[in-house]
Regions:
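Active-site beta-loop-alpha junctions enriched in small/polar residues
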Residues: 5-7, 34
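Short pre-catalytic strand/loop immediately N-terminal to key active-site residues, enriched for Gly-Thr
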Residues: 89-102
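Short, small-residue alpha-helix embedded
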Residues: 38, 100-131
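Short, well-structured alpha-helical segments that form the helix of a local strand-helix-strand
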Residues: 61-66, 122-137, 155
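Hydrophobic residues in well-ordered beta-strands that form the structural core
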Residues: 1-2, 75
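Charged C-terminal helix
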Residues: 135-165
């Protein structure tokens, strides 16, 4: 799983991510919507990035990027977009407080990796990982008072998930 943190922030980051993709062929590339847009613009469109694109535009870009790179793209946001270039799954689970907690994206990357270890279908594994994140986030937010308690409660809720959730 390649997390393209801040890929659009500097030329160095974009060049480094491009080299990693070329040499390692990641199974999953994960980023927030603006990171996926930046990667799309560099890999396919070669134009500037409009970070205010809506979900359907990000969906189109993620799908094209997944097809171009032959991998799964996970674009996180209020609605998570997961695609293999052919199929697109939108994950609506989650809570707005999750976006205010530092390192939540890093946690998502780790969870996707864990799900990939036990499910040989990368699209399915990525969808289940993001649904698990969202469900744990919703449950944690219901009894959190702010960002600090949210992270602690999220970790507890994540540990308490069951297959039937």
């Amino acid at each position: 799983v390649l997390d393209v943190v801040g890929v659009g922030a500097t030329r160095f980051r974009m060049d480094t991510v491009s080299k990693i993709i070329l040499r390692c062929h990641p199974t999953v590339i994960k980023g927030n919507a603006s990171e996926i847009q930046a990667l799309y613009s560099h890999q396919i469109a070669m134009q500037g990035v409009d970070s205010l694109l809506n979900t359907s535009e990000v969906e189109v870009q993620a799908k094209a990027l997944a097809k171009h790179l032959s991998c799964i793209i996970v674009a996180t946001g209020a609605i998570d977009i997961i695609t293999n270039g052919e199929n697109v799954v939108l994950v609506h689970e989650g809570h707005p407080l999750m976006g205010k907690v530092t390192a939540m994206g890093c946690v998502a990357t780790g969870i996707i990796g864990a799900f990939l270890a036990v499910n040989s279908n990368p699209l399915e594994a990525s969808v289940h990982a993001m649904k698990a994140m969202g469900i744990a986030g919703e449950r944690a937010a219901s009894h959190s008072r702010g960002n600090g308690t949210m992270m602690i409660n999220f970790l507890d809720e994540l540990c308490n998930l069951h297959a039937y959730d």
